[in-house]
Amino acid sequence: MIPQISQAPGVVQLVLNFLQELEQQGFTGDTATSYADRLTMSTDNSIYQLLPDAVVFPRSTADVALIARLAAQERYSSLIFTPRGGGTGTNGQALNQGIIVDMSRHMNRIIEINPEEGWVRVEAGVIKDQLNQYLKPFGYFFAPELSTSNRATLGGMINTDASGQGSLVYGKTSDHVLGVRAVLLGGDILDTQPLPVELAETLGKSNTTIGRIYNTVYQRCRQQRQLIIDNFPKLNRFLTGYDLRHVFNDEMTEFDLTRILTGSEGTLAFITEARLDITRLPKVRRLVNVKYDSFDSALRNAPFMVEARALSVETVDSKVLNLAREDIVWHSVSELITDVPDQEMLGLNIVEFAGDDEALIDERVNALCARLDELIASHQAGVIGWQVCRELAGVERIYAMRKKAVGLLGNAKGAAKPIPFAEDTCVPPEHLADYIAEFRALLDSHGLSYGMFGHVDAGVLHVRPALDMCDPQQEILMKQISDDVVALTAKYGGLLWGEHGKGFRAEYSPAFFGEELFAELRKVKAAFDPHNRLNPGKICPPEGLDAPMMKVDAVKRGTFDRQIPIAVRQQWRGAMECNGNGLCFNFDARSPMCPSMKITQNRIHSPKGRATLVREWLRLLADRGVDPLKLEQELPESGVSLRTLIARTRNSWHANKGEYDFSHEVKEAMSGCLACKACSTQCPIKIDVPEFRSRFLQLYHTRYLRPLRDHLVATVESYAPLMARAPKTFNFFINQPLVRKLSEKHIGMVDLPLLSVPSLQQQMVGHRSANMTLEQLESLNAEQKARTVLVVQDPFTSYYDAQVVADFVRLVEKLGFQPVLLPFSPNGKAQHIKGFLNRFAKTAKKTADFLNRMAKLGMPMVGVDPALVLCYRDEYKLALGEERGEFNVLLANEWLASALESQPVATVSGESWYFFGHCTEVTALPGAPAQWAAIFARFGAKLENVSVGCCGMAGTYGHEAKNHENSLGIYELSWHQAMQRLPRNRCLATGYSCRSQVKRVEGTGVRHPVQALLEIIK
């Protein structure tokens, strides 16, 4: 039995008083003080961990102003505040103690756009890709690019002055910020925009907080103009935080306070809104993917690409390329970046040309390719091949791979993981190759592996050395390397922070700015935040206050993780290896990961949040001397003793009375998971939440009783076959209003599915497919076996959507094969989802033995529901290991593609069909939609893939009363709109859950693709 974890870091009374008074004064946002909420805000995309006291989620600038006004009260003068955006920072920019002000949950409105003048006004929590999705119909985009664009907020981009691919042409975020609305500590609203210097000087004479800010910045930047110009490196990635260089324009006629706030990392004010310059979308985009025999060759050849008038040049090394090859993302780009025969591709330059004149762009591309051919022929520059990508969809797929490369590095095998701490250094591009050669020599001298990729056109390369932060000695080495890289960048006239901000690296600021200029930064900080209450420890302390700076060797995630025994860390790798990349925060409703995060906007309900909580849970167990591995081994095979039952009942009674246990917070996070498994493939680190969720639930329920619904779900494969013998009787009973009401109130289940009428057994009466014995199958000759297909049943389709199985049997017959309906054998997935892992292992072993016996017949076995078929491949393998055997159950599309391989493709005509894939299917097997389309094409039918996220049903998730609202909300995010615009009778869904959800919400259902094929085939 797991122990009660009754102690968690508490919240000081002053913070609780502040939050209470904040709500009393009309705050309309959310506040959070639970340990789980605070833990999810204690990390970002960096190696650091710092627990805040509380989190607030404002809904408007007025809410932020209320926070700032209340904070200025004398009784709260000791509290500190840190703004936070998407949490994608790689250096702890938004990590701090005190109160986190999260702008991402609610402040995500696009306020107005002026296409004629080319600007848009947004709230700070708008996500970069969200804005570009909005701008696309107007023919515009927000130009600064970054790899985390689908979850990074514009407020975060402004605060770190982010930039990435294309910065040589498009510049940094600050080059596109026309003005901001910021709230000062005290509640004053500061609106910035470029001003004539005379007006700025006049504003500085006002005896107000804003007046003093204008005066300080105006005077310091004017008086120290020459010092600033002399000390700021002449780089595309100029020195930010605070950008004294660009407050005045070159002619000294214009003054813009915005430049001080961009890159300020929340140390000066709360930026709540911004007016942004937007750029016309280029009409033509081309990529030339240039392949090299070494990474050094790729680096040294990059200036040549820039001279060819390319928009951007992105470089990727062999380590990143190889990790991409092992990831599901490679499926989308493999034809665009093919291998060169008899050559090893160890470096890649992704060269983009863009503009409005197609002839001009093609001329530049052709000229480059001709020159590349010359280099290949003469064996120069290490060029071994090239490919041109002319289609926009292909261009976007390659950049998606490049963006995912950041996270893929974290998926390197072993305890040492490539980590960010010196990952955005910038040097003049002409020195980059020599600089990187020295950088690599430094890392090689310590015997470290590393991955490299980046923006070679701008002199920025992302370098992530592999270190084990659970090893104290490697943590010390990280600081040593960091110090050495500071010296190395200085040697080449570069910067340690080229695009990701300073964060915990601010301790190096005096070395880059010089003491005299650093003193000027402190004066600026003092004008905005004299008492050092906004994100203290970052950028610089205010003048007149001897306050400490954050350090590179501050407390890290590894500091906590190393407290968990190594064996536990290894066995719970799924939770331990989350590196915080945050891809699970993807805003796009059409992205399958993560539906619970999308609907709740609560990061507890994301793979990263769940992994964070489980890591802390494991640490707290270790702190109490409890070994979860031993507990798992000691679990009884079946049943529980009376003493255990009494103990669980007592513990559950105390829990219902409000007795605290951190395990309850973890359980709440796990209960929100739909177990769709999108994270297990879409996450670059392959964080498999359903797997460690099941293990957690199994251990959690050693202490607490399971709800009745869990037992009903886990035994569905036992009672469904019995109920299917009299489906009308049971349906009549289930349909009674009183039964449904009692089910919702006492079991917690709603909208219970009805059994199929007629049942599958009734439909198959007299059909030869249902009456073949094993002996008859074994007696078939080779030719007969080659034409026989074994249909594997699953509990949901066979008993609740039997027509699909019956139609598949008929389809197999129609194609000239002999279908044989195998006896139903429980799959066990429902047991796995609910954490009945011992029971699941028994079910899996029994069914695996049966299917292995069938596999020996040498006939294909096929199932129609993706989630259940893929369970044989994934969960069975994890549960049984080698005992699983070698049996293989094919999906319907896999078998059809093979069976129809020799059939010619017919002329496509008529109305389209529309394919809605199951989350588990399209993420684990991304080629499935195309495979289905190819199958339909063989019969002259067009099948279009519909890009949607999760349907919200996910097995029994949508039937649980506590999930009902979220289930319907998830459906509304993408499925409902698609169903409304497409003809329902032409929509097809492979998942039983998906079809059930459509019928529940829309009133009429959709069919399985095999049913459409049965109709199509003449």
Swiss-Prot record:
Transmembrane segments: none annotated. This is D-2-hydroxyglutarate dehydrogenase. Catalyzes the oxidation of D-2-hydroxyglutarate (D-2-HGA) to 2-oxoglutarate. Appears to be the only D2HGDH in E.coli, providing the way to recycle D-2-HGA produced during L-serine synthesis by SerA, by converting it back to 2-oxoglutarate. The physiological molecule that functions as the primary electron acceptor during D-2-HGA oxidation by YdiJ in E.coli is unknown. Shows strict substrate specificity towards D-2-HGA, since it has no detectable activity on L-2-hydroxyglutarate, L-malate, D-malate, L-lactate, D-lactate, L-tartrate, D-tartrate, L-glycerate, D-glycerate, glutarate, or pyruvate. Pfam families: FAD-oxidase_C (PF02913), FAD_binding_4 (PF01565). One of its GO terms (molecular function) is flavin adenine dinucleotide binding. (R)-2-hydroxyglutarate binds at R402, H500. Optimum pH is 8.0. InterPro entries: 4Fe4S_Fe-S-bd, 4Fe4S_Fe_S_CS, FAD-bd_oxidored_4_C, FAD-bd_PCMH, FAD-bd_PCMH-like_sf, FAD-bd_PCMH_sub2, FAD-linked_Oxase-like_C, Oxid_FAD_bind_N. GO terms for biological process: lactate catabolic process. Residues 662-695 form the 4Fe-4S ferredoxin-type domain. Disruption phenotype: Disruption of this gene leads to the significant accumulation of D-2-HGA. It comes from Escherichia coli (strain K12). Activity is completely inhibited by the addition of 0.5 mM Mn(2+), Ni(2+), or Co(2+) and partially inhibited by 0.5 mM Zn(2+).
